[in-house]
Amino acid sequence: MDNIDNKYNPQLCKIFLAISDLIFFNLALWFSLGCVYFIFDQVQRFIPQDQLDTRVITHFILSVVCVGWFWIRLRHYTYRKPFWYELKEIFRTIVIFAIFDLALIAFTKWQFSRYVWVFCWTFALILVPFFRALTKHLLNKLGIWKKKTIILGSGQNARGAYSALQSEEMMGFDVIAFFDTDASDAEINMLPVIKDTEIIWDLNRTGDVHYILAYEYTELEKTHFWLRELSKHHCRSVTVVPSFRGLPLYNTDMSFIFSHEVMLLRIQNNLAKRSSRFLKRTFDIVCSIMILIIASPLMIYLWYKVTRDGGPAIYGHQRVGRHGKLFPCYKFRSMVMNSQEVLKELLANDPIARAEWEKDFKLKNDPRITAVGRFIRKTSLDELPQLFNVLKGDMSLVGPRPIVSDELERYCDDVDYYLMAKPGMTGLWQVSGRNDVDYDTRVYFDSWYVKNWTLWNDIAILFKTAKVVLRRDGAY
């Protein structure tokens, strides 16, 4: 393998990312003052002239401390974290600084303006993460943030690690090859599989290469061997991907027993906590009411369009809810009135359609769907009436995919996880390919969601849903 051209420069990355955060943290205050001036045509009424310089200097000091916290404590400029995980840490930090700013104003008896304070910290919550991501994107384009990476392993764990890294561009891991002396494939995902150990050491000498150990759980000795060898060759950058597929990860605390090679994983089931369920329910009610208010004109229009063929606008099909309780899952009708007869006739006469139905319980070219129905399905507008299911408590905004009773047997050992949560209007499978993923993958997504539930995950999935719906990914 030829020498690699590595433009990665960690010092420049730290400087650019820190400067970006510093600039836009401070611009948030000036933008807030601009908004106040634009709305009220004056600023002195909210911040007296003799306090303005002090407030600007204080905000600058807060920005320096915040950037220092990002740099030293959270390691945002050196340690590569997934986008949504890093965004959560940014939001949490800025909210803490906003509260500290409020306390500072109270103790110093400065004139307090709720408009300036709300505008300032709202802008900070938007500008800092947005331009952090933009800066990383530009650094990626220049190759400065990209880190040449080799994955050691060629099994399912290694392939899964590669797919995960490809989905997180902002992490900047540029995988150039796999390595496994026992691999049978010459290529994986169009990347070469290195089988000669000397090539690894040659690459290590010629560039700053990151190594990811992603062997299977049956290959633990290989992981130990390569950790030792990479350490002997002074490799500073090594990541281990344990084969923990199926275990809850988001709600897991890790600790060690001193002087023993024992790692303790404390696994929590958040959805089993009454406080978590109350928080999720409150979030569902508030958000669904807001969406209903905004979407009500559109829903009235769709009701009119759907009923033009003489049938009802909304129908409720029985779906499996929490603890196995059946409920009518509301949707705008997207099929002809005699849909069951059409389906029976199709499955009786078309073996290809029958095989597709038995595999996924869906048809890509479904003759039962009306012209209006095809549009509302493609845009997911047919699911808007499920907001009433959310208000009733049958469903959640985010959760596992609503299924019929016959599908429960397809969940096998994961059926207990499915029955622990309310079905959702959207979920992991909707933002991860929707109808383009196979049924086993849908089951995996549903069980993963339940095992790893956090409110932040729900928020992230809702934002991803908006993107998927606008792009119409995997919808039919």
Curated annotation (Swiss-Prot):
Pfam families: Bac_transf, CoA_binding_3. Residues 304-476 are cytoplasmic. This is Undecaprenyl-phosphate galactose phosphotransferase. It catalyses: di-trans,octa-cis-undecaprenyl phosphate + UDP-alpha-D-galactose = alpha-D-galactosyl-di-trans,octa-cis-undecaprenyl diphosphate + UMP. It is found in: Cell inner membrane. GO terms for biological process: O antigen biosynthetic process. InterPro entries: Bact_transf, EPS_sugar_tfrase, Undecaprenyl-P_galact_Ptfrase. Belongs to the bacterial sugar transferase family. Keywords: Cell inner membrane, Cell membrane, Lipopolysaccharide biosynthesis, Membrane, Transferase, Transmembrane, Transmembrane helix. Pathway: Bacterial outer membrane biogenesis; LPS O-antigen biosynthesis. Is responsible for transferring galactose-1-phosphate to the lipid precursor undecaprenol phosphate in the first steps of O-polysaccharide biosynthesis. One of its GO terms (molecular function) is phosphotransferase activity, for other substituted phosphate groups. The chain crosses the membrane at residues 15-35, 52-72, 93-113, 115-135, 283-303. One of its GO terms (cellular component) is plasma membrane. Its EC number is 2.7.8.6. It is a multi-pass membrane protein.
